[in-house]
Amino acid sequence: MTDADPTLRPDPLPEDNDRALRPQALDEFIGQAEARANLRIFVQSARQRGEAMDHTLFHGPPGLGKTTLAQIMARELGVNFRMTSGPVLAKAGDLAAILTNLEARDVLFIDEIHRLNPAVEEVLYPAMEDFELDLVIGDGPAARTVRIELQPFTLVGATTRMGLLTTPLRDRFGIPTRLLFYTVDELFEIVSRNARKLGAPAEEAGAREIARRARGTPRIAGRLLRRVVDFAVVEGDGRITRELADHALTRLGVDQLGLDGADRRYLRLIAENYSGGPVGIETLSAALSESRDSLEEVIEPYLLQQGLIQRTPRGRMLAQKAWTHLGLDAPRPPGQSDLFG
């Protein structure tokens, strides 16, 4: 297996929308303790004051719960939840249609907000600051600006690329919240709970095996769990043991660190063809027939987080942990002789 496994990628898949597995309240949400504690304060304050909660920006790697937290916020505020995404809002009129239909204190969630059209973003500024919408009607000399009053609302933005947000947009969010990768213990809790909901109870060692290979991401943990449940039903007795989880995940090409075929191919290329690096990203892109964006956004973040690779001014290099994981010996630096040589 050499291709990127969709199961191990944090991007959403249709099967991720299983409402039964999603937490419905902050108390049910596992992980992100600091973010949850702060959000609980902000939600309670907004409810007691009877005002719209301040605009909130969730940023961090994909699959960590940004959409789920936004839905929980709306539920705990007792208001409606509207959802869209940056690429969908092609024209200012698209955004205006959504904003003018919001009721007082509603939550509007914009996923991938870093991909907003600049013209749409300009319309968003007065809407966020003054709850007003300035629309241009007509063309040429006959054009005129119409100001529309909006109901106070809460904008919740989500981005995986904080650096791509313009400064004016970023500064208009009063509650910036970074979401972090989950610990194995947190993922273990999530896997154990969801296994019970799926009717395939997991032994502690079985749930922990799935958690260890889930790349710190609940979305991936949920997908791996579903696949392991399939194996438990067909090849086992319906229970998830450590042996069954290990067997199923190995069959799926997921190794002990949660790497898939594409990850291992990336590491092995640097090890075998470039002596561990440094090697430039463009060279890797050509050798792997992958786009640079795909390498930088999909494959490299987890390898960096695990300390398997290093980014240097001269290119990518393998860390000692990667050599060990591949079962290869790292080459000696040039000019370094053997201890007894």
UniProtKB/Swiss-Prot annotation:
Chain residues that bind DNA: R292, R311, R316
Binding positions (ATP): L21, R22, G63, K66, T67, T68, E129, D130, F131, R172, Y182, R219
Pfam families per the UniProt record, alphabetical: AAA_lid_4, RuvB_C, RuvB_N
Principal location: cytoplasm
Record GO biological process: DNA recombination; DNA repair
Segments of this protein annotated with the region Large ATPase domain (RuvB-L): 1-182
SMART domains: AAA (SM00382)
Reaction(s) this enzyme catalyzes, per UniProt: ATP + H2O = ADP + phosphate + H(+)
SUPFAM superfamilies per UniProt: P-loop containing nucleoside triphosphate hydrolases, Winged helix' DNA-binding domain
Cellular-component GO terms for this entry: cytoplasm; Holliday junction resolvase complex
MF GO annotations: ATP binding; ATP hydrolysis activity; four-way junction DNA binding; four-way junction helicase activity
Location of this chain's protein in the cell: Cytoplasm
Assigned keywords, A-Z: ATP-binding, Cytoplasm, DNA damage, DNA recombination, DNA repair, DNA-binding, Hydrolase, Nucleotide-binding
InterPro entries tied to this protein: AAA+_ATPase, AAA_lid_4, DNA_helicase_Holl-junc_RuvB, P-loop_NTPase, RuvB-like_N, RuvB_C, WH-like_DNA-bd_sf, WH_DNA-bd_sf
Chain residue ranges for the region called Small ATPAse domain (RuvB-S): 183-253
Entry binding sites for Mg(2+): T67
EC nos: 3.6.4.-
Residue ranges of the region described as Head domain (RuvB-H): 256-341
PANTHER family documented for this protein: HOLLIDAY JUNCTION BRANCH MIGRATION COMPLEX SUBUNIT RUVB, PTHR42848
Assembly and interaction partners: Homohexamer. Forms an RuvA(8)-RuvB(12)-Holliday junction (HJ) complex. HJ DNA is sandwiched between 2 RuvA tetramers; dsDNA enters through RuvA and exits via RuvB. An RuvB hexamer assembles on each DNA strand where it exits the tetramer. Each RuvB hexamer is contacted by two RuvA subunits (via domain III) on 2 adjacent RuvB subunits; this complex drives branch migration. In the full resolvosome a probable DNA-RuvA(4)-RuvB(12)-RuvC(2) complex forms which resolves the HJ.
Function: The RuvA-RuvB-RuvC complex processes Holliday junction (HJ) DNA during genetic recombination and DNA repair, while the RuvA-RuvB complex plays an important role in the rescue of blocked DNA replication forks via replication fork reversal (RFR). RuvA specifically binds to HJ cruciform DNA, conferring on it an open structure. The RuvB hexamer acts as an ATP-dependent pump, pulling dsDNA into and through the RuvAB complex. RuvB forms 2 homohexamers on either side of HJ DNA bound by 1 or 2 RuvA tetramers; 4 subunits per hexamer contact DNA at a time.
Family indicated by similarity: Belongs to the RuvB family.
Domain notes: Has 3 domains, the large (RuvB-L) and small ATPase (RuvB-S) domains and the C-terminal head (RuvB-H) domain. The head domain binds DNA, while the ATPase domains jointly bind ATP, ADP or are empty depending on the state of the subunit in the translocation cycle. During a single DNA translocation step the structure of each domain remains the same, but their relative positions change.
HAMAP family to which the protein is assigned, alphabetical: DNA_HJ_migration_RuvB
Protein's recorded name: Holliday junction branch migration complex subunit RuvB
